[in-house]
Amino acid sequence: MGKKIMLQGTASNVGKSVLVAGLCRIFKQDGYTVAPFKSQNMALNSFITKEGLEMGRAQVFQAEAAKIEPIADMNPVLLKPSGNNKSQVIVRGKVVGEMPSSKYHDYKLELVDVLKETFNSLNSRYDIVVMEGAGSNAEINLKDRDISNMGMAEIADAPVIIVGDIDRGGVFASLAGTMLLLNEDEKRRVKGVIINKFRGKKELLQDGVKMLEDIIKVPVIGVVPYTDIKIEDEDSVTTRFKKKMNKSDIHIEIIRTPHMSNFTDFNIFETQEDVSIRYVDYGESLGNPDILIIPGTKSTIDDLTYIRKSGLESQIKNLHSQGKLIFGICGGYQMLGKKLKDPYHVESEIEEVDGIGLLDTETTFEKEKTTTQVEATIVECISEYMNNLKGKKVKGYEIHMGITKRGNDVRSLDLITKKLDKEVNYTEGSVNKEGNVIGTYLHGIFDEISFTRAILNNIRKKKGLGELESKVNSFNEFKDKEYDKLADFLREHLDIEKIYEIMK
């Protein structure tokens, strides 16, 4: 069996996911085979593997850092919040059902064997498994059924490093308080702590570090400065949503709905120098974007209701009348249609609701979930926004419960040619007659830079600007370089030799 180490946190969003990714890349650089593992993840950001199984995106980018193919066993339990204190429960990549938190709390004990099996499988195949906890590891009211933090560390017999976020303040109290709430067996597992997201001069922190070590009786393995290395965030508690538009040639606005999922679909735009992004929150009005995107969502009907109540629907239609480009991904695609039907109450108690009506489509929610990777070719080129798009190859993945039928006033966007490595031939997506409203089920479609850059250059041409080439030729290559930057950065600020000593 291989070695293992587990990073746990004093709270959510302390930076565990990025640190795990960095360690995965460091160990890979040092000649080891390495895999990430997170027993339970709660997130709306998910991914579909080559086997058609669903998993959290955090373990996907960690697997990328380790230079291995992501598999669902790296995240055996995924919870996707669906509102009203309920979550869709996904085990080993497949939907088990929707459960209220009280029912899931009891169900967790049935998952212990699954966690043992999936972890042991990875641990037997890789030299090192880097494990990640979830949220705070000292939730004393949930400890008897913990499968995410110390409970999982016990299953795996893994040493633990605790991560605290100094940027939010109170890091010494949070680390010391966390240690105080652990029982003696759990304390013995903790071999060190990391102070993350530090801003300022480290010299000013040294006395505090020494005092903390005296209190908690374990070493501070590193003080990691805040960094803007472009690595995916695990959940929506992220600074990217707080960004406002900077001066740039092309402005993109994305409606941040309450159940927005897969915001990683839009990370590619941050690599394009002529693009600025603004996420539109509740109570905010749309501006004058060149592209408006309605993203994917875990609860399409609820988020459509949100768009109506917030007054955004009329603003969306106004942008359409101005000829602006409107793009819907997955749930956003469904909303842009004329009707959404839910005969089996998959989404809500409402059986039928009018859509925004900018696409001549009708969506019916089905009981079975579509989860697949696909490859496609763009087939439509019917407006100035779509010049030079015909024939472009794109890849993506689908995660949805609905089936969308096109009417006579729309055309298909793309031809699916491969599905889960099998050759197929069917059309997908919709484009209105004017060519300025586009819908697709393909998450990740913008990651194909030739496709995305063609759209951006069409907008530049429409605005009387010259074309630009992307400085990033491949999004995967760009991410790979960022993982190397992250590894170099962590080598500088963490005691990597100490981490090797800790692993067992």
Curated annotation (Swiss-Prot):
Transmembrane segments: none annotated. GO terms for molecular function: ABC-type vitamin B12 transporter activity; catalytic activity. It comes from the Bacteria. The active site is at 330 (nucleophile), 443. The keyword Lipid biosynthesis does not apply. Residues 249-451 form the GATase cobBQ-type domain. The keyword ATP-binding does not apply. Pathway: Cofactor biosynthesis; adenosylcobalamin biosynthesis. InterPro entries: Class_I_gatase-like, CobQ/CobB/MinD/ParA_Nub-bd_dom, CobQ_GATase1, CobQ_N, CobQ_synth, GATase_3, P-loop_NTPase. Belongs to the CobB/CobQ family. CobQ subfamily. Catalyzes amidations at positions B, D, E, and G on adenosylcobyrinic A,C-diamide. NH(2) groups are provided by glutamine, and one molecule of ATP is hydrogenolyzed for each amidation. HAMAP family: CobQ (MF_00028). This is Cobyric acid synthase. It comes from Clostridioides difficile (strain 630).
